[in-house]
Amino acid sequence: MTMRIDIATLFPEMCEAVLGESIIGRARRAGKLEIHCHNIRDYTQDKHRRVDDTPYGGGKGMLMQTEPIYNCYQAVCEMIAAKPHVIYMSPKGQPFSQQRAIELREYENIFILCGHYEGVDQRVLDEIVDEEISLGDYVLTGGELGALVVADAVGRLCPGVLSEEVCFTEESHYSGLLEYPQYTRPPVWHGMEVPAVLSSMAPDRIVYVSCDPATLARDVKRLE
């Protein structure tokens, strides 16, 4: 089955601008991956399309209201006739990692909620959210950038999105290691040469050099 990712946001055009390009954009057009960006304002009953209000107990800023978010979520549930795995992009969430991206790839439907303003009414989070994810210990204007990172990292792992599985299984972080140094033409640039052990080989003989200290010496010896 093709994975479907739904993103609930106040700025769907911002998300589409990124997810409509490059590998993810091509995968969407080829039917290898579904991504739908929903404007939360489309699900409010307020005639001014308002989706926020002042928090009880005081405090600065505004909070996103429950109903527009819940209505958007319910609409997606009806579209897919199932309950998606719901992620809320939050500074309180678990740090995102390649391992979590690999695990999320197993879901058929993912719904990502992007917060804004001072956050989201806790009640709707308690009602629909399965997990909260953070990109790190810093503050962003909204959850959109985080949602784009998650959608890209998970989406590129789906079958058929990349040309070959080796494209991502040998990448940095996939197996807990960093990717090996790589080189292309010209053979000399700013006085720096491509390692002779690589430049002297025919293309069909070039293999990767491990970054794992335990196997680095073995791989270099094989290249010599």
Language-model-derived ranges and their functions:
Residues L198-E224:
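Rossmann-like S-adenosyl-L-methionine
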Residues L145, L157-A196:
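Internal, active-site/partner-interface "lid" segment
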Residues M1-C77:
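N-terminal nucleotide/polyanion-binding subdomain common to many enzyme families
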Residues R4, L104-E106, L198-M201:
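Short, conserved loop/helix-junction motifs that constitute active-site signature segments
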Residues D6-A8, H36-H38, I87, I110-F111, ...:
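Hydrophobic/aromatic beta-strand patches that form the interior of the parallel beta-sheet core
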Residues V120, V124-E171:
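Structured adenosyl-cofactor binding patch, chiefly the S-adenosyl-L-methionine
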Residues F11, G115, D212:
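Active-site glycine-centered loops adjacent to acidic/histidine catalytic or metal-binding residues
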Residues Q65-H116:
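S-adenosyl-L-methionine/SAH cofactor-binding core of RNA-modifying enzymes
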